[in-house]
Design a protein with these regions (language model features):
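Conserved class I S-adenosyl-L-methionine
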Residues: 108-121, 142
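Core SAM-dependent methyltransferase catalytic element
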Residues: 239, 280-302
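Extended basic-aromatic, gly/pro-enriched interface segments that bind polyanionic ligands
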Residues: 139-241, 245, 249, 253, ...
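Conserved beta-strand signature within the Rossmann-like core of class I S-adenosyl-L-methionine
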Residues: 267-275
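Conserved AdoMet
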Residues: 2-114
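A short glycine-rich, Lys/Arg-flanked "PGG" loop and its adjoining helix->strand segment in the class I
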Residues: 255-267
Length: 302
């Protein structure tokens, strides 16, 4: 099928590689070029187009573009992926709350966190679990990504049981089994098995558990292309987390993205990057915090 779709096609993989970079900034490495062409063929096949017809249709069809992006992007993430970063954000939130309490000020400002490139939402839900576990209530976590398919999963908040194993026991209270919509399932004996966590899971269901409803009011998932000038929100953030995403961009694009992220950060707030990322960055309004485990910058002026 791929050979048929590629027949009489004047485009090669480099055309598609440049197209992806132009649209969303991602510079795909050589090892992902076969994945890229598989995504192109998959998208063309789904719409009964040749690869060349797909190319010609993309400029005027935003839905088709989004489907191609969804097929190309690999949403790699997991719960509690980098615990030192999560702990840092939680401690900062607690510090702000205690300072307001000690001074007697009525600081009811919402504690806002933005997770950039949140994929299917695990980092956002992780942050929500960590803040809620400290009895904090006035916080909002924004998750953004360029993959609408990944965001749909994030909003659903349902994951397979293997991912639950990465959540520390202290936070398991923020998870619960997925309830079946089929009221007859128990009557007809729908196949179930008991996992290592002692909870029965429907083997026919791809989603075995979900985040607790009490967390949903604190999170919001929005489509956003960080490569563009558009802002996902007008609210300044106390913390912005952007980890393991900048590596997909060229250095000069990384610099532009970091500048836009710092503009969205409130004075006194923090920008948390992955260890080793953006070591070339020297902004005048941010200072790097000395920390043994995380790569964090504090905004010191507007």
């Amino acid at each position: 099928m791929a050979n048929i779709l590629l027949r009489d096609n004047p485009l090669n993989v480099q055309h598609w590689r440049r197209y992806i970079e132009r649209e969303i900034g991602f510079v795909l490495p050589d090892v992902q070029l076969q994945w890229l062409m598989n995504a192109v063929v998959q998208t063309a096949t789904a719409h009964k187009l040749t690869v060349f017809q797909l190319w010609m249709t993309l400029p005027t069809n935003s839905e088709l573009r989004q489907q191609l992006f969804d097929a190309v992007i690999i949403p790699e993430t997991r719960f509690f992926r980098h615990i030192p970063s999560i702990d840092f954000v939680t401690e900062f939130a607690l510090q702000r709350y205690k300072q307001a309490e000690n001074t007697g000020s009525c600081d009811d400002e919402c504690f806002r966190v933005w997770s950039v490139g949140c994929a299917s939402g695990q980092e956002v839900w992780t942050l929500a679990m960590s803040l809620a576990s400290e009895q904090l209530k006035n916080f909002e976590i924004l998750g953004t990504d360029v993959s609408e398919k990944a965001l749909e999963k994030a909003r659903l908040g349902q994951y397979d049981k293997r991912q639950r194993c990465t959540i520390p026991q202290h936070f398991q209270k923020f998870t619960q089994p997925v309830e079946s919509n089929d009221d007859l399932s128990d009557i007809v004996g729908s196949p179930k098995n008991k996992g290592s966590d002692g909870i029965e899971h429907d083997r026919n269901s791809p989603s075995h558990w979900q985040v607790a409803p009490l967390l949903r009011s604190h999170v919001n998932f929005v489509w956003h292309n960080v490569f563009t000038q558009e802002k996902p929100t007008s609210d300044l953030q106390q913390v912005i987390i952007c980890q393991n995403m900048l590596l997909y961009f060229r250095k000069f694009d990384q610099r532009d993205i970091l500048k836009r992220l710092s503009a969205q950060c409130a004075v006194g707030g923090y920008l948390v990057l992955a260890p080793g990322e953006a070591l070339f960055w020297r902004p005048s309004n941010m200072r790097r915090i000395v920390h043994s485990q995380i790569n964090v910058w504090q905004k010191i002026s507007a």
